Structures are given as structure tokens and as C-alpha cells.
Amino acid sequence: MLLEHVTITLLNNTSFALLPEAYAPFDPLIDVLPIIPLLFLLLAFVWQASVKFR
């Protein structure tokens, strides 16, 4: 029952946390920030491909 409520709540919200009103202009940036570590992971593969996986 509780799990269903949490799942429905998360699916209804576009973001998991709401920023205070003063930080509303930064909302698109906050949505992108979790992707940055994945970009570093991809960069490691591109780097290794450029040196032929030595």
C-alpha cells in the first residue's frame, strides 16, 4: 500500500525534489547535473580508444 503510494507520487512528479522558489531558474541545470559523472565515464572510454586501449 505504501509502496504503491510512493510509486504513484514519484510518477506524478517530474522531479524528485522541489527547489525553493528563489532557485527556480536553476531547475533545468539541477535536472542535468546527475548526468555529469556518466560523461566522465564515457570520456574514459573515448580516451582509451584514442590511445588504442594500451
Curated annotation (Swiss-Prot):
UniProt superkingdom: Eukaryota
Family, as annotated: Belongs to the PsbK family.
Job of this protein: One of the components of the core complex of photosystem II (PSII). PSII is a light-driven water:plastoquinone oxidoreductase that uses light energy to abstract electrons from H(2)O, generating O(2) and a proton gradient subsequently used for ATP formation. It consists of a core antenna complex that captures photons, and an electron transfer chain that converts photonic excitation into a charge separation.
Protein name: Photosystem II reaction center protein K
Assembly and interaction partners: PSII is composed of 1 copy each of membrane proteins PsbA, PsbB, PsbC, PsbD, PsbE, PsbF, PsbH, PsbI, PsbJ, PsbK, PsbL, PsbM, PsbT, PsbY, PsbZ, Psb30/Ycf12, at least 3 peripheral proteins of the oxygen-evolving complex and a large number of cofactors. It forms dimeric complexes.
PANTHER family: PHOTOSYSTEM II REACTION CENTER PROTEIN K, PTHR35325
UniProt GO BP: photosynthesis
Membrane-topology annotation of the record: Single-pass membrane protein
Gene Ontology CC terms, in alphabetical order: chloroplast thylakoid membrane; photosystem II reaction center
Organism: Euglena mutabilis
Transmembrane region(s): 29-49
Subcellular location: Plastid, Chloroplast thylakoid membrane
